[in-house]
């Protein structure tokens, strides 16, 4: 892997690039890590991104977005959007077309992938054609009155409980 800095409006957004062992560079997975918007970084997801690159044969660009509570909303989605905009608007950097770039994330990162897609649509600067949302955080109702049966059936007895999700 190699590290790079995306500079946006006076701030620096670190990214880490992973190339597959096959040396194929015909597409990119733009990865946003999970962690409830408060934990995780490109170091903690290093192995995940390296494996993702090798298994899929794609380049992976992992974004080290700013975390809460030190950085209030919308810091994280703005960082992710800035990196995506850089990649989509300077396609010569990777010699790609928009079709070859997929936004991907897990949990809070999946939420960010969806948010970046919506921001791109609304701002009209670029438009991602594909996203992969791995167990996305898309609803905020995980309390006792949650309408989701899975919260009641699986909200206890696991590492990430319904109560912990509410705390995020």
What residue spans do the PLM features occupy?
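Alpha/beta-hydrolase superfamily serine-hydrolase fold, recognizing
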Residues: 2-168
């Amino acid at each position: 892997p190699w590290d790079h800095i995306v500079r946006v409006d006076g701030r620096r957004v670190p990214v880490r690039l992973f190339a597959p062992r096959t040396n194929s560079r015909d597409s990119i997975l733009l990865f946003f890590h999970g962690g409830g918007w408060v934990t995780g970084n490109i170091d903690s997801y290093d192995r995940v991104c390296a494996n993702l690159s090798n298994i899929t044969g794609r380049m992976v660009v992992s974004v080290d977005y700013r975390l809460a509570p030190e950085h209030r909303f919308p810091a994280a989605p703005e960082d992710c959007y800035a990196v995506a905009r850089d990649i989509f608007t300077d396609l010569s950097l990777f010699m790609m077309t928009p079709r070859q770039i997929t936004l991907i994330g897990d949990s809070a990162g999946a939420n960010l992938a969806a948010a970046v897609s919506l921001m791109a649509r609304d701002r009209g600067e670029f438009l991602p054609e594909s996203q992969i949302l791995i167990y996305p955080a898309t609803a905020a109702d995980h309390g006792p009155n949650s309408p989701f049966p899975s919260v009641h059936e699986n909200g206890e007895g696991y590492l990430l409980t319904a109560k912990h999700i509410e705390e995020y």
